[in-house]
Amino acid sequence: MHSLPVNLVLTVLTVFLTSPAQVIGYRPYPPKTNGSDQIFDASKKFEGSSNLVRLRYHMGPVLTNNITVHPIWYGTWQKSQKKIIREFINSISAVGSKHPSVSGWWKTVQLYTDQTGSNITGTVRLGEEKNDRFYSHGKSLTRLSIQSVIKSAVTSRSRPLPVNPKSGLYLLLTADDVYVQDFCGQVCGFHYFTFPSIVGFTLPYAWVGNSAKLCPGVCAYPFAVPAFIPGLKPVKSPNGDVGVDGMISVIAHEIAELATNPLVNAWYAGPDPVAPVEIADLCEGIYGTGGGGSYTGQMLNDHSGATYNVNGIRRRYLIQWLWSHVVSYCTGPNALD
């Protein structure tokens, strides 16, 4: 594997809307290093650890109530693909999964509190779902038309999704033939909240796209690799679907940040609330001990050679680490330290 210096790149991959609102964006592939990387001490024991990171609480709400995730399946999805994603969501709160587990990964999220000292919930469950198999808003979506898709899901005459502003998360998942504004070039997923002027309610939501046809080397890394890293070989995906296995880490990233910063006024670093650096942004591309730069860190392999770092209920997944504000470093349940 092509090796670059072990460090954390704090170039936050957030994207600005052309409309007045701005949305957090994320892409998992290894960023190109630059001079700012040198502020991090590669000899530190814990990945991404730095006294220079100032993740602060800005007094906004976090999700202390039990979380219900409502997937919206936009476009054509195979049953096998839906099952991979559903089982990941159900694994977040699962007890008894083999170590290292998805639920162990979520414990870092649970460290975060609101202004009363209440921790983020340990209960995340799969809620009602909505299928939009006929591409109701076309195959090319803007950031604002995404909100229109969510509006259609919660106002549908036939089995609308429940409206739950306090503990509901609305997860829009687009099929591999759908293009979303800035997809592949700048983001693989983002989260924000809906505007009452469009949807009728303020609802925390996230979008994640299947990159299998459009840009797997960008959004399904390390199951596919970007062209700017010559000689680097992809690893085998744990569930046999490069696009969906690549989505899992992006979904994990966005759910963790929705829980800790649902209205973009709670936990984040940086001076700008409309372009915050959040708990998953700080650990982008780190999946194991030693991770940073273009190196994912030490991961695990199953008997078939597939790569993963956490166990779910019945499946294995590869998901990025998260920032712990308690100890000021990126951490995950598969850490070797």
Curated annotation (Swiss-Prot):
Upregulating conditions: By brassinolide.
Disulfide bonds: none
Any one of the GO CC terms: apoplast
Localization of this protein: Secreted; Secreted, Extracellular space; Secreted, Extracellular space, Apoplast
Glycosylation, residue list: 34, 66, 119
Keywords: Apoplast, Glycoprotein, Secreted, Signal
Leader peptide range in chain numbering: 1-25
InterPro entries hit by this protein: EXORDIUM-like (IPR006766)
Main location: secreted
UniProt-listed PANTHER family: PROTEIN EXORDIUM-LIKE 3, PROTEIN EXORDIUM-LIKE 5
Function, as annotated: May play a role in a brassinosteroid-dependent regulation of growth and development.
Family affiliation: Belongs to the EXORDIUM family.
Protein name: Protein EXORDIUM-like 3
Source organism per UniProt: Arabidopsis thaliana
